[in-house]
């Protein structure tokens, strides 16, 4: 075999080994590290629920509309329809004192497929404002994040929650139902 053929064979084997080694190391880094981001969690202390107050009720936000919530033991479920009627959502979570940690889904009206629904986590802290009105002070995040977007609601007097009035599921949702 000539020196040129031996050199070409050596270079081809070396290049193949380097490419395979690089691919294995790169794939290992991707699998081991994921996307490198950790979920963001709320650091909100739980306190006692304000006297004579309950999570059950209807709350209002100018963008997210009316949020209907029902408390069942340690669980709270809710549904909302945006003020512009473009989306509706559902949440389910566990309360501890005046703090509720929940998971949520929001569905775009008239849209189907994977992009029609977004989901995430969030929290609410039940408080009384300066005028002694009950409010929900909280945030929600996308996917595994629990924070990132503010969501503040004022509890509406003399409104009864009706989960069945919102969304595409006539049965409503049950605690932990999604």
Language-model regions: role of each:
Residues 3-20:
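Bacterial N-terminal signal peptides that target proteins for export
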Residues 29-32:
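C-terminal motif of bacterial Sec signal peptides marking the signal peptidase cleavage site
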Residues 42-132, 140-178:
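Central antiparallel beta-sheet cores of small beta-barrel/beta-sandwich binding domains
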Residues 34-36:
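Bacterial signal peptide processing site
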């Amino acid at each position: 075999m000539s020196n040129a053929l031996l050199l070409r064979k050596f270079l081809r084997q070396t290049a193949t080994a380097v490419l395979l080694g690089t691919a294995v190391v790169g794939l290992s880094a991707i699998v081991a590290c994921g996307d490198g981001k950790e979920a963001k969690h709320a650091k909100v202390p739980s306190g006692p629920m304000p006297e004579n107050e309950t999570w059950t009720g209807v709350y209002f936000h100018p963008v997210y509309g009316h949020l209907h919530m029902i408390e069942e033991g340690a669980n709270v479920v809710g549904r909302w329809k945006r003020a512009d009627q473009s989306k509706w959502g559902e949440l389910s979570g566990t309360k501890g004192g005046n703090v509720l940690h929940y998971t949520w889904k929001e569905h775009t009206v008239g849209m189907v497929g994977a992009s029609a629904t977004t989901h995430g986590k969030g929290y609410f802290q039940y408080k009384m404002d300066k005028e002694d009105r009950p409010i929900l002070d909280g945030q929600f995040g996308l996917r595994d994040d629990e924070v990132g977007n503010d969501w503040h609601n004022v509890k509406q007097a003399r409104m009864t929650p009706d989960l069945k009035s919102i969304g595409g599921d006539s049965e409503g949702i049950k605690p932990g139902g999604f």
